[in-house]
Structure formats: structure tokens, C-alpha cells
Amino acid sequence: MAKVESFTLDHTKVKAPYVRLITVEEGAKGDKISNYDLRLVQPNENAIPTAGLHTIEHLLAGLLRDRLDGVIDCSPFGCRTGFHLITWGEHSTTEVAKALKSSLEEIAYKTKWEDVQGTTIESCGNYRDHSLFSAKEWSKKILDEGISDKPFERHVVD
């Protein structure tokens, strides 16, 4: 079986919340795709409940696209501690951390239920499992801790 980088990361050494560049892959025509680890809570110490994580996912899908060029996808980790962000091209971890911070600020302090995309039976595969309240509370907690652009030391972005 192929080795997966995320499973070789020593989860006891990272200091969440942070943004980490996992890899940059280059296609046959030279196009680059980057994969980032957006770690919102400390692994094996906490996990975001599914309803809040699900709502954060739906909101980040739009908010990160508003802030970063080339966003392909933002998908939650099964462990519920953060997200993979996949983009065309390369962004610095500082740029991604600032976009994430700004997005979480919007979730925490401005977002209303009407702003959450994909919350109907037609538009979501598990539309009943959402909580804007939880998304807001977790966003505030993450923002209070500060988002670092380095995974192994705290270097909080402004």
C-alpha cells in the first residue's frame, strides 16, 4: 500500500492551530497542485463535533475561494481536527493562514444561517447535521488561540 504523508506526520509534535504545506505536485504539463493541512485543533486532545465541522466545511468552501485564487477543494479530516485545502499553484503558508483567519472571523462574527450554502435535502448529503452555533463557537476558540503559519512552533499571523 502507498505511504500517505499525513499518516507519517508525528501528530504529537505539531502545535495547532496552524497551516502546513503538505506537498506540491506537478502535472505532466507543468501545472502545480498544492495540498495544505489546515489544523484547527490539537490532534488527540480535541475534535470538532460533526455538525459544527460540517457547517465550517460548507462556509470555508465559499469563504476561502473569496480570499485565495485557485481553490479546488477544502475537505475535513476524518479525525475532525481540521481540513485538507487543495489549490492550483502555490500559496505561502502565511497567505493561507491569513485567509483562514479572515474566513473564521467572518464565520464567528458575521455569518447568519441564511449565509450557509448547501443546507437543504437537495444540496447536501447530510443536511440535518449542521450547527452554525457550534461553527461560530469553534471559530472563536481557534481565533483566540491564534493561527500559526508554522506547524511545529507558534508563529501566529496577524
Curated annotation (Swiss-Prot):
Keywords assigned by UniProt, alphabetized: Autoinducer synthesis, Iron, Lyase, Metal-binding, Quorum sensing
Gene Ontology biological process terms, A to Z: quorum sensing
Binding site for Fe cation: 54, 58, 124
Molecular-function GO term, any one: S-ribosylhomocysteine lyase activity
Cofactor: how and how many bound: Binds 1 Fe cation per subunit.
Keyword Lyase belongs to the record: yes
InterPro entries linked to this entry: LuxS_sf, Metalloenz_LuxS/M16, S-ribosylhomocysteinase
Enzyme Commission number: 4.4.1.21
Statement: the UniProt record of this protein carries the keyword Metal-binding: yes
Cofactor: Fe cation
Family matches, as HAMAP family: LuxS
Entry protein name: S-ribosylhomocysteine lyase
